[in-house]
């Protein structure tokens, strides 16, 4: 999947580890949204 930034990854600075995965729509079952950013198209999720 496409990596995305979770709040736990720290500020959005080039070189940071991106520990989330983009899910179109909303997170899959067993995953949780891992940041506060609101996007109607996708959520950044973590297992």
Curated annotation (Swiss-Prot):
Matches recorded under Pfam families: Toxin_4 (PF00706)
GO molecular function: sodium channel regulator activity; toxin activity
Predominant location: secreted
Domain of life: Eukaryota
Keyword terms, alphabetized: Disulfide bond, Hydroxylation, Ion channel impairing toxin, Nematocyst, Neurotoxin, Secreted, Toxin, Voltage-gated sodium channel impairing toxin
Assigned GO CC terms: extracellular region; nematocyst
InterPro entries per record: Myo_ane_neurotoxin_sf
Compartments, as annotated in UniProt: Secreted; Nematocyst
Disulphide bridges, residue numbers: 4-44, 6-34, 27-45
Residues modified as Hydroxyproline: 3
Stated family: Belongs to the sea anemone sodium channel inhibitory toxin family. Type I subfamily.
Purpose: Slows down the inactivation process of TTX-sensitive voltage-gated sodium channels (Nav). Has a strong crab-paralyzing activity. The minimum lethal dose against crabs is 7.9 mg/kg.
Protein known as: Delta-actitoxin-Cgg1a
